[in-house]
Amino acid sequence: MERALPAAGFLYWVGASTIAYLTLRASYSLFRAFQVWCVGNQAFVGPRLGEWAVVTGGTDGIGKSYAEELAKRGMKIVLISRSQDKLKEVSNNIKEKFNVETRTIAVDFSLDDIYDKIKTGLSGLEIGVLVNNVGMSYEYPEYFLEIPDLDNTIKKLININVLSICKVTRLVLPGMVERSKGVILNISSASGMLPVPLLTVYSATKAFVDFFSQCLHEEYKSKGIFVQSVLPFFVATKLAKIRKPTLDKPSAETFVKSAIKTVGLQTRTTGYVIHAIMGSINSILPRWIYFKTIMGFNKSLRNRYLKKTKKN
């Protein structure tokens, strides 16, 4: 009995220490959640970083909402997208609504010979914020070998989702480093957090965006550059083919108002509190449950799409 007492005492302190550690960890997590989602960092992004903000894919959805939010904060806006008509319309609306200067650069990011034109268009500008938003996804969930026009689709997905981020960052980052300040927001996706079968190439490109962002932040944070990977779940946009916003599928405007307050607080964010909860649930699910669920969901979307197109 006497020999058991020291062992019991040791186990008591191990248990007490474990409980104290878990309590502190939970308390810190709750504090951080309150700081990020309730308080936010509203003043981090603005003209103090530089006169201009550059937004790729800025004529629709999340990109357009970022451009409007940055203009609202007093930044001049450069929109880079494919359609000159849309660029003109959105830039004029931003100019009139927020009384800021705007510029446009019309390029097709599926091509790889566009970056000299972008370089010329950005020459001489004091760029404080870069939003790498341009992206494309599948027309519908599909098995890899059955993707229509597979070779061309692979090339376009890589050029638009991967090459564009590397090349535009290459053009903008030197000026930020020279001035020792700047923010780069790379729009990834929740599909980049965990593998998404039937969206295989898209999911892989978004995982690249996430890793690229994390690495770039570590390389350049000492130079005053903040790089954030933004990983939203569904947002009501044309790309996502969702028209009506809901609590878990916010409008692009609602999403961006939430996401921009996380800049300076999180280098990796879902951007929206409901999406943060969804991400936490996904991260603790056993992989077999996750894959069974996501395969079932995407198979259902695939079958629905193919049935609809067959009717038409």
From Swiss-Prot:
Cellular component GO terms, alphabetical: endoplasmic reticulum; extracellular matrix; fatty acid elongase complex
Major site of localization recorded for this protein: endoplasmic reticulum
Binding site for NADP(+): 50-79
Keyword Cell membrane belongs to the record: no
Binding site for substrate: 189
Topology relative to the membrane: Multi-pass membrane protein
UniProt pathway annotation: Lipid metabolism; fatty acid biosynthesis; Steroid biosynthesis; estrogen biosynthesis
EC identifiers of the protein: 1.1.1.330, 1.1.1.62
Reactions listed under catalytic activity: a very-long-chain (3R)-3-hydroxyacyl-CoA + NADP(+) = a very-long-chain 3-oxoacyl-CoA + NADPH + H(+); 17beta-estradiol + NAD(+) = estrone + NADH + H(+); 17beta-estradiol + NADP(+) = estrone + NADPH + H(+); 3-oxooctadecanoyl-CoA + NADPH + H(+) = (3R)-hydroxyoctadecanoyl-CoA + NADP(+)
Location of the active site: 202 (proton acceptor)
Leading EC class: oxidoreductase
Family, similarity comment: Belongs to the short-chain dehydrogenases/reductases (SDR) family. 17-beta-HSD 3 subfamily.
Record's protein name: Very-long-chain 3-oxoacyl-CoA reductase
Gene designation per UniProt: Hsd17b12
